[in-house]
């Protein structure tokens, strides 16, 4: 497998990206990595960190898409950027997957303009896994589509079902629609119309509406919503996790007795923190694009990049792209 990596994307690029590549190649010596970015910087980093070097190819790219760049404009104007060149390689079949911690908007715009969408998909969507009491659930969409139609919500659920069952190994995953109440008639027009489509769909295990307050305790395997709501849920979850541990730190420092208690609880709190750590999840696939694209967190370190590359590998090895095409084609013929 040949995996493309955007070396210039993310707050900690290119150092964290090269660290992630080095970790990955230590465990996956049969795969090849193609790195896109400033060759002079990348070569210096790779010589120090990456072995074996013969499994590495560097494609020199002189431009970089910044987080503040307007996505579509950047894709059209920065032709020699690591994202544009990497996606072009993906389109031409020179790599099997592309991983980036760069601009989400640019990745989505580039995926649509360069790689293209799966036939029958109205809008691709971005997913992520979020923690709850007993594990993780998949949230879709988390920011790609702030305005949606009911057909978009249905297709998000269909794509997520294939991904969760084939990559994450959850048979017949449950699907819930994020709403302001559990009753069937709750919500705005989008929610009500989406509910009817989801309820009548034969290829998903729809369990009804789900409220936000149940997400930390007993969510379905997949929670579907528009990207505006999904991004708020994502950012709030990240923020609450940080707040929780900041409060614990303050309490642990409040007295000598609290410090002793904190030391005793430290290994257990470390395990708890791991559940909220995006580094372990790695990345979020862009479902609906006609190619494997994995978006890593903008603040990714080497471990997060390593996990993101593994996400791309699992997507590829489980033939998820072909399965998504089959699913959408079958549904459109009904």
Swiss-Prot record:
Alphabetic keyword roster: Cytoplasm, Lipid biosynthesis, Lipid metabolism, Phospholipid biosynthesis, Phospholipid metabolism, Transferase
UniProt pathway annotation: Lipid metabolism; phospholipid metabolism
Entry-linked InterPro entries: FA_synthesis, Phospholipid_synth_PlsX-like
Keyword match Aminoacyl-tRNA synthetase: no
Compartments in which it is found: Cytoplasm
GO annotation terms (biological process): fatty acid biosynthetic process; phospholipid biosynthetic process
Enzyme class: transferase
GO cellular component labels: cytoplasm
One Pfam family hit: FA_synthesis
Gene3D superfamilies linked to this entry: Isopropylmalate Dehydrogenase
Catalysed reactions, as listed in the record: a fatty acyl-[ACP] + phosphate = an acyl phosphate + holo-[ACP]
GO molecular function: phosphate:acyl-[acyl carrier protein] acyltransferase activity
Primary role: Catalyzes the reversible formation of acyl-phosphate (acyl-PO(4)) from acyl-[acyl-carrier-protein] (acyl-ACP). This enzyme utilizes acyl-ACP as fatty acyl donor, but not acyl-CoA.
Subunit structure of this chain's protein: Homodimer. Probably interacts with PlsY.
Family: Belongs to the PlsX family.
PANTHER family, alphabetized: FATTY ACID/PHOSPHOLIPID SYNTHESIS PROTEIN PLSX (PTHR30100), PHOSPHATE ACYLTRANSFERASE (PTHR30100:SF1)
Full protein name: Phosphate acyltransferase
Native source species: Caldicellulosiruptor bescii (strain ATCC BAA-1888 / DSM 6725 / KCTC 15123 / Z-1320)
Name of the gene: plsX
